Amino acid sequence: MLLASTTSASQLFVEMPEFYAWFRFRCDSYVRFWKAIHAAAHAARPGIDVRFNDCWIYPEMLGFDLKGMSPYFDSIRAADYVEETGDPELMVAKRGFYHAVRRAVGLDKHFVTALSQRVRATPALIKETILMSAQCGADGTTIASYDTATPALLRAVREGFAEAGIEVAAPARAG
């Protein structure tokens, strides 16, 4: 009704006020849910990082109002993994996704992205994801699916950070 049509969401809300009422209820319910989760988690363990893992390019279509929810999570991770499809045309939507997340949560919210190195990903798409993360205001990048990564994709991660001018800190040693 919406994604496959040229009709805008605004027009559907005008035509079907009950749809808007349901949608508003759903968004408000998720905000209340995250408020309760955040309060309970911080009461049980002060200093905990309550993170929202956003893997939907259009989270609002599911009723996730990131702007309304963001006071009730401490960080957000954007993980759509389109680079693992091997299709460079999907990267345009990925950039829009990252910008939308940063816009919704503001500049002060800790925001990390994710990249996947599954076999259809290419070194070029891995590098593009890393650069895009930096350009879109991410505070860091997480690496997923490294267990299935080829040596070329693992090298692309290292090279991507270097080419983007991002210094990767050595992991802290336990002890």
Residue map of PLM features:
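Polysaccharide-binding and catalytic clefts of secreted carbohydrate-active enzymes
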Residues: 1-88
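Surface-exposed amphipathic alpha-helices with a cationic face
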Residues: 34-46, 99-109, 158-161
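Alpha-helical scaffolding within the catalytic cores
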Residues: 55-68, 88-103, 124-129
